[in-house]
Amino acid sequence: MPSTSMIEDRGEIERRRFEYLDHPADIQLHSWGTTIERAFEACLVSMFGYMTDLEKVEEQYEFYWKVSGDSMDGLLFQFLDEALNSFHAEPCFVAKRVEIMRFDKEKLEIEFRGWGESFDTSKHETEADIKSPTYSNMQIIEKSDRCDVYVIVDI
């Protein structure tokens, strides 16, 4: 199966709830869901999917995180950055699936977990190295039946 970053089939893109948009120097992640929680989850999975083929990632163990922010954009940044730090440092965790267990919009806190495994160069291919999410052109668009999230990541 082609990597997530190469999928162009609209049906498959809709099923996954994310796509990659061209950007002059980096890449823009666009994710969506029926709620802000589902859109954030899809955004995080899309970030991992841009770095490696998630079809080759097994759900071997769970990893837990808790983050807070000073704004909704800051919360999204911390959400992505904390998970990315778990990929860049031991145990080099890559999540195939993510679930937000608690999303407090007033306190700007998220507790979440991911299912995946440690990145293994003998099993997983590196497709891109994401250094960090950015605030550049970050957008969270909430409507009554859908939330869209746009994040440019530094590669």
Swiss-Prot record:
GO terms for biological process?
tRNA splicing, via endonucleolytic cleavage and ligation
**SUPFAM superfamilies (UniProt xref):** MTH1598-like
Q: Which GO terms describe its cellular component?
A: tRNA-splicing ligase complex
Tell me which stretches of the chain form a coiled coil: none
Q: In which residues is Ca(2+) bound?
A: D26, D154, I155
What keywords is this UniProt entry annotated with?
Answer: Calcium, Metal-binding, tRNA processing
Q: Which InterPro entries match?
A: Archease, Archease_dom, Archease_dom_sf
Molecular function per GO: metal ion binding
| Keyword presence, ATP-binding | no
Highest taxon above the source species:
Eukaryota
Q: Which family does it belong to?
A: Belongs to the archease family.
Q: What is the role of this chain?
A: Component of the tRNA-splicing ligase complex required to facilitate the enzymatic turnover of catalytic subunit RtcB.
What is this protein's name? Answer: Protein archease-like
Q: What's the gene?
A: arch-1
